[in-house]
């Protein structure tokens, strides 16, 4: 993320997301609620963060994220690929990793297989954004003959 905080700065919601605090949408909500400060002043939607900025979230300092995390996880059936803690079967609580991570893409609850999780938004963008034109391949096993 340090390469993103340059002379032009980056938007506060992206800074918080890249720092592993929350998603950009969640950041916008926290900013509107007054829970984010930049240099001691309440942040506004669209505020920019610079290298010398001091950012706090709920009174705690937020710095440039530490080590980037990328986890390859063999998701079992019954686990939901969501960060929503209200879902008792969510993948984040199941893995219980000490740093905020989120899934790259998703697998259905009844599916099992490889899913990647990370705290690095640039990896997510590189994999999921359509402009990068990645081919997706799925291997499916069925329990009866396909006739059509």
Pin down the residues of each PLM region.
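Basic, flexible Lys/Arg- and Gly-enriched helix-loop patches that mediate nucleic-acid binding at interfaces
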Residues: 2-148
